Amino acid sequence: MTTNYIFVTGGVVSSLGKGIAAASLAAILEARGLNVTIMKLDPYINVDPGTMSPTQHGEVFVTEDGAETDLDLGHYERFIRTKMSRRNNFTTGRIYSDVLRKERRGDYLGATIQVIPHITNAIKERIIEGGEGHDVVLVEIGGTVGDIESLPFLEAIRQMAVQVGREHTLFMHLTLVPYLAAAGEVKTKPTQHSVKELLSIGIQPDVLICRSDRTVPANERAKIALFCNVPEKAVISLKDIDSIYKIPALLKSQGLDDYICKRFSLNCPEANLSEWEQVVYEEANPGGEVTIGMVGKYVALPDAYKSVIEALKHGGLKNRLTVNIKLIDSQDVETRGVEVLKDLDAILIPGGFGYRGVEGKIMSANYARENNIPYLGICLGMQVALMEFARNVAGMEGANSTEFVPDCKYPVVALITEWRDENGDVEVRDEASDLGGTMRVGGQQCHLTEGSLVRQMYGEQTIIERHRHRYEVNNMLLKQIEAAGLRVAGLSADRKLVEIVELPDHPWFVACQFHPEFTSTPRDGHPLFAGFVKAAGAYQKRQVK
């Protein structure tokens, strides 16, 4: 089987939406029966985004196999059925790290290590490895054409077009076509200059995606085609739109998928976008709306919670409800009190690291529990719910996590290596143990408790969800907490780690150690988010009565 490559680049300005455009095109090609995957090549020097600030980079998306990746991989999984893996995302830092490790081992036999050919060869090897077994591979190059950081990647894909053959490679370039109100027209010159920049590197784009706040007129598209040496039918207008889930249909209506299939000589049926039409219909025809408060520490940049925000919207689709998300800084709860939580139909506390704002999250969990407001805690959101319950219900005054107070009297949350077994002996788990070291990352099996609310929502006994955390519930204090009324609703494969807790005497109070947002999609939703939004709607109705 021959693999075909579509290389996606961006020009003029950043944040044009390369990831969404690539994912939307992939969705159309998948709907034509093709086996499609998407890769993201990031030009920054960090080895991966795992230790980058969420307020700079946005969220870290975790794949099934435990890779900490760019948030664009979340878009990819929400648009296509293919599961992403560590092969779908790599950075300049990762490439240089691998090449330097080989050099230290002597793999290059004393050769002088250079960007060309050693770095570019490593990039090409990664692309080919990531695309194995697929009909079409879309490869998104991060950054903007003209950035010095992107040059090795652009040179690598130029070489791939020569080596793989132009009949199996296609360059798709996103560019800005701004509208000038004073002139009353769109301007094509930035696009021409962006293409000129690409040509200077040796890349002739085959498809131009013209981003604008309005439809680019046919005469302007013809002008772009002529000056940029691109067929007129390959100049696609992609205007700003109120829903990203309308983009597959918008691209298909302009024949982009037909053009690509003909270019690659792929004989496949017409795309059936009925699933996406259903998503758009559900989004456009809600039966009501709910307001959900998300209490976090990175609210200045909503992209830090991108998958959570999207998953809440998916939960709304499944319940035909518009979800209005109110982002609340947990430090505001600390300084202004629970007044900032008024008029919410539900409260969600997402994951996070560090002590700043934790007490505000604990106050929020307390407010939700005492006022019967639907609550969903994710990762740290589960840990703060546990701390709150231990303090105020189980009689464990000052209960905390050793992440924040290492010597606290009641460490209800602790590092794996800090646990003691029932005999009082320290239980040590290192990298060779079945459940890894102090960081659990990636898909893990979870067994749901019979008769629990989550067992009812999932409709399955065993599930697999993705984790990214260092701290866990301390089993030594668990019995006292359970005796006070908290139910353990999910356990790890070896039955040693608490994965889900819930309150049986609360209308809807669920907290999980894993990140369910990473597996939610617009077409299928996710049981926890669908149930959470449904509970928010029910709470709203009770308040009206």
UniProtKB/Swiss-Prot annotation:
Keywords: ATP-binding, Glutamine amidotransferase, Ligase, Magnesium, Metal-binding, Nucleotide-binding, Pyrimidine biosynthesis. Pathway: Pyrimidine metabolism; CTP biosynthesis via de novo pathway; CTP from UDP: step 2/2. Mg(2+) binds at D72, E140. Its EC number is 6.3.4.2. The keyword Ligase applies. Residues 291-542 form the Glutamine amidotransferase type-1 domain. Allosterically activated by GTP, when glutamine is the substrate; GTP has no effect on the reaction when ammonia is the substrate. The allosteric effector GTP functions by stabilizing the protein conformation that binds the tetrahedral intermediate(s) formed during glutamine hydrolysis. Inhibited by the product CTP, via allosteric rather than competitive inhibition. One of its GO terms (biological process) is 'de novo' CTP biosynthetic process. CTP binds at S14, D147, I148, E149, K187, T188, K189, P190, T191, Q192, K223. CDD domains: CTPS_N, GATase1_CTP_Synthase. UTP binds at S14, K187, T188, K189, P190, T191, Q192, K223. It comes from the Bacteria. Homotetramer. Belongs to the CTP synthase family. PANTHER family: CTP SYNTHASE, CTP SYNTHASE-RELATED. CTPSs have evolved a hybrid strategy for distinguishing between UTP and CTP. The overlapping regions of the product feedback inhibitory and substrate sites recognize a common feature in both compounds, the triphosphate moiety. To differentiate isosteric substrate and product pyrimidine rings, an additional pocket far from the expected kinase/ligase catalytic site, specifically recognizes the cytosine and ribose portions of the product inhibitor. HAMAP family: PyrG. Catalyzes the ATP-dependent amination of UTP to CTP with either L-glutamine or ammonia as the source of nitrogen. Regulates intracellular CTP levels through interactions with the four ribonucleotide triphosphates. This is CTP synthase. It comes from Pectobacterium atrosepticum (strain SCRI 1043 / ATCC BAA-672) (Erwinia carotovora subsp. atroseptica).
